[in-house]
Regions:
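Compact, glycine-rich, soluble single-domain proteins
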Residues: 1-79
């Protein structure tokens, strides 16, 4: 799954980011491969807001579409 597909309350682990330009942009936002992040908002046709390291960061949808993630858990008890 990709980052743009996560739902609010979902925790995911950032997967391998193959494209160099995407990896650089993600690093600028503090996202590294293997990092655990929580989605706090997924605005339809807008940004995905993530919480990690005690901070919130908004990721543009175009960038989020290019970052693969692995679901860890959901605040509603889903896996």
């Amino acid at each position: 799954m990709t980052l743009d597909e996560v739902t609010c309350g979902m925790a995911v682990r950032v997967g391998m980011i193959e494209e160099k330009e995407v990896r650089v942009q993600a690093l600028r936002l503090g996202l590294m491969e293997g990092e655990l992040v929580m989605c706090t908002a997924n605005v339809w046709a807008g940004a995905i807001v993530l919480e990690h390291g005690g901070q919130e960061v908004a990721i543009g949808r175009k960038l989020a579409e290019r970052i693969r993630v692995w679901p860890v858990w959901h605040s509603r008890g889903e896996r």
